[in-house]
A protein has these predicted regions:
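Short acidic/glycine-rich loop or secondary-structure boundary segments that cap or lie
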Residues: 183, 231-235, 240, 272-274
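Acidic-and-aromatic substrate-binding clefts and catalytic sites of carbohydrate-active enzymes
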Residues: 51-56, 83, 121-127, 150-157, ...
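Hydrophobic faces of well-ordered beta-strands that scaffold small-molecule active sites
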Residues: 5-7, 73-75, 114-117, 143-145, ...
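Active-site gating/metal-coordination segments in enzymes
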Residues: 71-205, 211-212
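Mid-to-C-terminal alpha-helical segments outside catalytic/metal-binding sites
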Residues: 2-7, 12-72, 100-108, 129-133, ...
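Catalytic metal-binding/acid-base residues of hydrolase active sites
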Residues: 10, 148, 178-179, 228, ...
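Active-site region of glycoside hydrolase catalytic domains
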Residues: 208-221
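Active-site gating loops and adjacent loop-to-helix segments of metal-dependent hydrolytic enzymes
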Residues: 13-53, 181-201, 238-261
Length: 338
């Protein structure tokens, strides 16, 4: 049976400090327990998200993994904790709390979890310092970053040095949507989650390509959450724009050339969407991801991959587990600590 690696899962420390009491700002996420197995993530005094102990308890996660046939989870922070809006030193402390917790969780269960860190990208020098600590001291396998930093797209020159160092150190980057575009038009129907997230993810991918980041740093390893959002669908439109507006070009080749280097998780809920992703980028560039433990997650993880009849057994095996390890620079068969 194919090994199953759930690349897209989120975790938060049960005892995350109350940063409102330590630093200025009311936007710090605070975990308020509602019972022994439940809590609210509070932001600015309002409930941002209701969560269960699945989001902090490794033991509960392993129970669910065993029940759903998942061998390994890749742990990453919840995007609301990125705290890009805060003073860099305060945000660095928030990053350290989470990175240390994730690293400790991996050390407790090294055969079940792989860790990704977070860095305060509002200050690139501080973020590079924490990225180095994550990889070289904590043993984390990559860094999760948001799709924008305080409204700046990822091709903004402010982030050039970060991407340069990520490429130099061969650090995989998992790009996850947060603070989506058009929020003022999305308060109803939870449009932020169903429309905003796909649109925001597509904009991030397009920015990295059209802004020249991928041409400048061709060895960057980048994986987009949520199947890349609407990016796979709009890629031909991006190519057309590149061809008809030569005066706007910042790259020597059309977007589809650079897009082939991207990885994507499989979280698009539908076999036709998954087939488009594979047709456009190759099955080797798709990793299984469920968004555990949140409400919109795929249950069981890998369900759509299993149901996509056009895939061979070898292709499914790659998507369900092997591609994630390859992306994270973990040699298959040599153990997670290699």
């Amino acid at each position: 049976m194919a090994m199953r690696v759930d690349f897209h899962t989120h975790i938060i420390p049960e005892d995350i400090p109350n940063f409102i009491e330590r630093f200025d700002g009311e936007r710090w996420p605070v975990l308020e327990k509602t019972c022994s197995c439940g809590a609210n993530i509070m932001v600015a005094g309002k409930v941002f998200r209701e969560v269960t102990d699945q989001v902090w308890s490794p033991q509960k996660r392993i129970q669910d993994m065993d029940a759903e046939g998942v061998d390994i989870q890749v742990l990453s922070p919840i995007p609301v904790t990125f705290s890009y809006w805060a003073e860099p030193i305060a945000a660095e402390e928030m990053s350290k709390v989470q990175n240390d917790f994730i690293a400790d969780t991996v050390k407790q269960y090294p055969n079940r979890f792989i860790g990704l860190g977070t860095v305060p990208l509002q200050d690139v020098e501080v973020s590079i310092r924490e990225m180095q600590r994550c990889i070289q001291e904590l043993g984390l396998k990559g860094i999760e970053i948001g799709t924008n930093i305080n409204g700046k797209n990822l091709d903004d020159p402010a982030f050039t040095k970060f991407f340069e160092m990520a490429e130099r150190w061969e650090v995989p980057l998992f790009i996850h949507p947060w603070e989506t575009l058009g929020t003022e038009r999305m308060p109803r129907h939870n449009f932020m989650y169903t429309v905003g997230i796909p649109s925001e993810t597509a904009l991030a991918a397009a920015s990295l390509i059209l802004g020249g980041v991928m041409e400048r740093f061709p060895k960057l390893k980048i994986c987009f959450a949520h199947g890349g959002g609407s990016f796979p669908s709009i890629l031909p439109r991006l190519d057309q724009g590149w061809h008809v507006w030569p005066h706007l070009r910042q790259t020597t080749k059309p977007p589809s050339y650079y897009a082939k280097s991207f990885y994507f998780d499989s979280l698009n809920y539908d076999a036709l969407n998954l087939k488009l992703l594979i047709d456009r980028f190759g099955f080797e560039k798709v990793v299984m991801g469920s968004d555990y433990p949140f409400l919109l997650r795929e249950i069981p993880p890998g369900k759509v991959v299993d149901e996509t009849l056009e895939l061979t057994d070898e292709q499914k095996k790659a998507i369900l587990g092997e591609n994630a390890l390859t992306f994270l620079n973990i040699k298959i068969g040599e153990g997670l600590e290699s």
